[in-house]
Regions:
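Hydrophobic helix-and-loop "lid/oligomerization" segment in the mid-to-C-terminal part
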Residues: 1-68, 72-103
Length: 103
């Protein structure tokens, strides 16, 4: 995982993992001191890019993921993006995080 904006952990992997494992990883990243939000990106079984997101702070993960087609609530959200790569979705995610913090 990498640290972004001093309070967000982002983990992106190129290997498919079960959804439950990605959700657990999102939860566990919040246990790191100072981390208020986490995003785990991974390829899904059908080639889509999956995102599992969690927050315990001011970062509303639902609002961050809505522009990417995701949903959920302020503390727990997810997205499935078809026709893209983990790397490209990571760039879109970072842009969406930046936009969230600018508003």
């Amino acid at each position: 995982a990498r640290l972004y904006r001093n309070e967000i952990a982002i983990s992106a992997v190129d290997t498919p993992v079960p959804r439950a494992i990605a959700s657990q990883a999102s939860d566990e990243l919040l246990n790191i001191s100072g981390i208020l939000a986490s995003f785990v990106l991974y390829p899904g079984a059908e080639g889509e890019v999956m995102i599992s997101a969690r927050s315990i702070g001011s970062c509303n993960v639902q609002m961050v993921l809505e522009p990417l087609g995701g949903g959920g609530n302020a503390a727990t959200a997810g997205a499935q993006i078809r026709g893209s790569t983990v790397r490209d979705v990571l760039r879109e995610l970072v842009a969406s995080i930046d936009k969230f913090y600018e508003t």
